[in-house]
Amino acid sequence: MKDPRDIPNETKWRLAAGYAARLPVLYDAAFRPVAGEKYDEIEQEIWMDLSRTAFAIARDLTLAVGTAQDLAETMQVVMVILFGPGFRIEALNVSADRSVILVKRCPFLEQEGASFGAGSPVFRRCMAFTLTSVPLLNKKYSARFVRTMCTGDRQCEIKIAEAEDLTATTKKKK
């Protein structure tokens, strides 16, 4: 029998993260028929609660959260820790108070197997986690999704800026 300590940590992490990424799909298949429309609300609460873990990781690893770029880099680290090395993420510095997270590969989307459009369960999960995590890490900032792979875009783009700046930008576009 092989001793688990002989398996490289990177391999164990990759395998565990792959199975963890599959869990939302399995839960959806098992519980949606029972919970019906209530399932989305319950699942959103779970992903919002998971953002507390993002805060705990940032605190425990003393990750920087003071600027938009700090937040983007911290979210990059947290998402890879929580969701595995299958995530391919970049944190781009746009200006002193703005940053963009680019997601180029998403293990959750890979588990879903296809593009689902605006009603994608992957998008709802990611949105609940990300939009809750950023202000928990620094209440002056918020996040806004600009592009998403689960709605057919080539990559996800998530803007991070001071909360009032994102609100003003959104109102101008309406």
Where are these regions (language model features)?
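ATP phosphate-binding glycine-rich loop and adjacent ATP-lid/helix-beta elements
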Residues: 125-130
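N-terminal accessory segment detector
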Residues: 1-99, 107-124, 135-136, 140-174
